[in-house]
A protein has these predicted regions:
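PLD/PLD-like phosphodiesterase catalytic module centered on the HKD motif
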Residues: 1-146
């Protein structure tokens, strides 16, 4: 998609800032694949877990809801997304999303970061790192079963 559409970006929690140990492990395992899609990936470092689910298309379509864009949300959970055709709402949502970008660093495919807002990364504590690696190595393969 990012080859055909300009200005496609994704905001997610950094590994150190992620309050979801399974999400953190999944991102750790798949980060290179995600970055190699050509998406502009921003890692939120706000000190509490980012849980937003919003999409902006052009300057008039806004998509807001609880859908996690994963198989669990498709088949198990009761999730929804609201699609709104409104330039005013799109502009307001864009401003809100940009405010999160100011507390994030842009991850690059080479492993480095662009940090235009001089954001201090959230440290991955030794406990959380061990927990994430345990999940990555022994539990993550089961994520498709739930």
């Amino acid at each position: 998609m990012s080859d055909k559409v300009e200005n496609v970006s994704l905001m997610t929690n950094s590994i150190g800032n992620n309050g979801n140990p399974f999400g953190s492990a999944d991102y750790y395992v798949n980060k290179d694949k995600i970055l190699n899609t050509g998406l502009e990936v921003w890692e939120y470092e706000g000190g509490y877990s980012y849980h937003g689910k919003s999409i902006l298309i052009d300057d008039n379509i806004s998509v807001i809801g609880s859908f996690n864009v994963d198989m669990r949300s498709v088949y198990l959970d009761t999730e929804l997304m609201l699609v709104i055709d409104s330039r005013e709402i799109n502009s307001q949502l864009n401003e809100a999303m940009e405010s999160y970008e100011h507390i994030a660093r842009k991850a690059d495919a080479d492993g480095s970061y662009d940090n235009p807002y001089d954001v201090e990364p959230v440290e991955l504590t030794p406990y959380r790192e061990k927990r994430m690696k345990l999940i990555k190595n022994f539990i993550l393969w089961t994520r498709y079963l739930f």
